[in-house]
Amino acid sequence: MAAKEIIFSEKARSRMVHGVNLLANAVKATLGPKGRHVVLDKSFGSPIITKDGVSVAKEIELADKFENMGAQMLKEVASKTNDHAGDGTTTATVLAQALIREGCKAVAAGMNPMDLKRGIDKAVIAAVTELKKISKPTSDDKAIAQVATISANSDESIGNIIAEAMKKVGKEGVITIEEGTTLENELDVVEGMQFDRGYSSPYFINNQQSQIVELDNPYILLHDKKISSVRDLLTVLDAVAKESKPLLIVAEEVEGEALATLVVNNIRGIIKVCAVKAPGFGDRRKAMLEDMAVLTGGTVISEEVGLSLEKATTSHLGKAKKVRVSKENTTIIDGIGDNDAINGRVKQIKTQIEETTSDYDREKLQERVAKLAGGVAVIKVGAATEVEMKEKKARVDDALLATRAAVEEGVIPGGGVALIRAITAISNLKGANEDQTHGIQIALRAMEAPLREIVANAGEEPSVILNKVKEGKDNFGYNAATGEFGDMVNLGILDPTKVTRSALQNAASIAGLMITTEAMVAEAPKKDEPTPPAAGGGMGGMGGMDF
C-alpha cells in the first residue's frame, strides 16, 4: 500500500478552499446574461467554447491532491444540481463558494464547525420555504418561452422553439434534441413513444459518440415473460436476419444464454439487435406492452392469448421508422400502428382516468395517454460551425430541462432577486447559540452572491446594485442585459423554483461537509530516484582524439 500524506485542521481547510476557489472562479465567469465564455482544450478535435457551468466544472482537475479534493467536491454540487434540475449549476457553485469561504474563516476564528453547519442548514430550510411561497405556477406559453430564453443565455430563438415544442406535444410529451443540417433551429413533431428503460447490455450500442443504440426501420418483438433460452428466439431471429432488418426486443427480462447470444450476434454483425426490459410492473406492464403493440401494429406474445415465443413469426412483430435506446430511456418513433386503433386505445385509457379514484393511477394513466397521443418533438439545432453547434446544443439541453423544472414547481423572479427577497423575509432568524446565529448570517450573506456575480460580470458595481434591489419589494430587480431596474416578471426574467431550490440545498450540503472537515488524507508524492552518473566518454589513452 502506498504511503499517505495527512494534513490537519487549518492547513487542510485552506488547501481545500484554494481548490474550491480555482474551480468556482472559472465557473462563475459564465453567470448571467453578460457572463463570459470559457474555452476548454480537448485532446482531440477543436477546443470547445462554452457558457455552461457544469461543462467547465467537469473539465477541471488540479495537480495538487488536496486542492483537487476541494475542487472535486464542488464539482459534485454542479453535477447534482444539473442532474436534479437541469440548470442552476453556476448558481450552485457561486453559493457553495461563498458558504465554504465564510464558513472556513469562522472556523479559523475559533467557532464551533458543527454549530455553524446547523445554522446554515436552518437558514436554508427557512429560505426554501420562502422560495415556495414566492413561486408562481407556469401555465402559459409565454412564461415557458421566457424561462427557456433565460436558461439558454438570453437566446430568444431557443426559448420560442422550446415553448412551441411543448405546445405541440404537451407538457408531459417527449422532446429530443438533435444536430441540424442548416443554420437555423428547426422543430419536427414525430408520432412516437418513450419509456424509462434502457438497453440490457452496453454491447448493443452502435453510436459510440452518443453512447446510444439507433435502429432504423426495426421489427419490434413484445413479450410479457422472461427470455432465458435462445431456443425460444431462433425462429424470430432467423426470419428477421433473412430480411436484414434490425430487431428491438421488449420483454420482462432478457438474460443468461439468450442475452449472451444476442450480444455475440450483434457484435459480429449477423443481426442488429437490442434487448430492453419492459416498463412498469404487473398489470401496468401488460397494459404498457399493449400500448406499444397498438402503436407499432404488432401483437404482445403472451401465453394468456395462446401465443408462444417459439411459434412467433414476423407477422406478430411491430414495426417503427426509428428506435433510439439510451442507458435510461427507449424512444419508439413513427410506429406503423393503425390510427383508428390508437385513437380507440386513447379513448379507453381516458375512460379509465375518469373512473379511477387513485391519484397515482390517474397520473400513470395520463402518462400513457401522453405517450400514445403526444408524440415526440425533435428540435434540430442549427449552427455555422461544429464548435458553435456543440455550444448551442448544450444550451438547448439546459433550457429544456429548466423549462421542465418550471412546469413542475413553478417560477420565481430571476436574476438572484428571489434569494434577496428570501433573505429579507428570514433576516430575524436566530440560532440556539451565538455560533449557530453566525452560521445563519453566513448563509444569508452567501445568498447575495449570485446577484453580486451577475452584476460583476455585467461590469457594474455589485454593492450599489444590491442595495438598490434590497430597497425594492416583490419582483423589483436588476436586468443585467440592459442595465435597467424593473419588475423581473414583467421583463420576462424568470427562474424555475426547482433550479434555485436545488442549487441552494446542494451548495449548503457540500459546504457543511467542508466546514466540518478536520483532516485530509492523500497519496504521498513519489520521490524521484537519483539518476546514476553518466559513463565517461572514450577509451583510456584516447583523450587527444577528435570524434
Curated annotation (Swiss-Prot):
Domain of life: Bacteria
Pfam family, one: Cpn60_TCP1
Subcellular location, principal: cytoplasm
One MF annotation (Gene Ontology) recorded for this entry: ATP binding
InterPro entries linked to this entry: Chaperonin_Cpn60_CS, Cpn60/GroEL, Cpn60/GroEL/TCP-1, GroEL-like_apical_dom_sf, GROEL-like_equatorial_sf, TCP-1-like_intermed_sf
GO CC terms: cytoplasm
Gene3D superfamilies assigned to the protein according to its UniProt record, in alphabetical order: GroEL, GroEL-like equatorial domain, TCP-1-like chaperonin intermediate domain
GO BP terms: protein refolding
Compositionally biased intervals (Gly residues): 535-547
Residues at which ATP binds: 30-33, 51, 87-91, 415, 479-481, 495
Compartments it resides in: Cytoplasm
Keywords in alphabetical order: ATP-binding, Chaperone, Cytoplasm, Isomerase, Nucleotide-binding
Catalytically driven reaction(s): ATP + H2O + a folded polypeptide = ADP + phosphate + an unfolded polypeptide
Region spans: Disordered: 524-547
CDD domains: GroEL
Enzyme Commission code(s) on record: 5.6.1.7
Family: Belongs to the chaperonin (HSP60) family.
Role played: Together with its co-chaperonin GroES, plays an essential role in assisting protein folding. The GroEL-GroES system forms a nano-cage that allows encapsulation of the non-native substrate proteins and provides a physical environment optimized to promote and accelerate protein folding.
NCBIfam families documented for this protein: GroEL, PRK00013.1, PRK12849.1, PRK12850.1, PRK12851.1
Record text on subunit structure and interactions: Forms a cylinder of 14 subunits composed of two heptameric rings stacked back-to-back. Interacts with the co-chaperonin GroES.
Protein name: Chaperonin GroEL
UniProt organism field: Xylella fastidiosa (strain 9a5c)
Organism lineage: Bacteria, Pseudomonadati, Pseudomonadota, Gammaproteobacteria, Lysobacterales
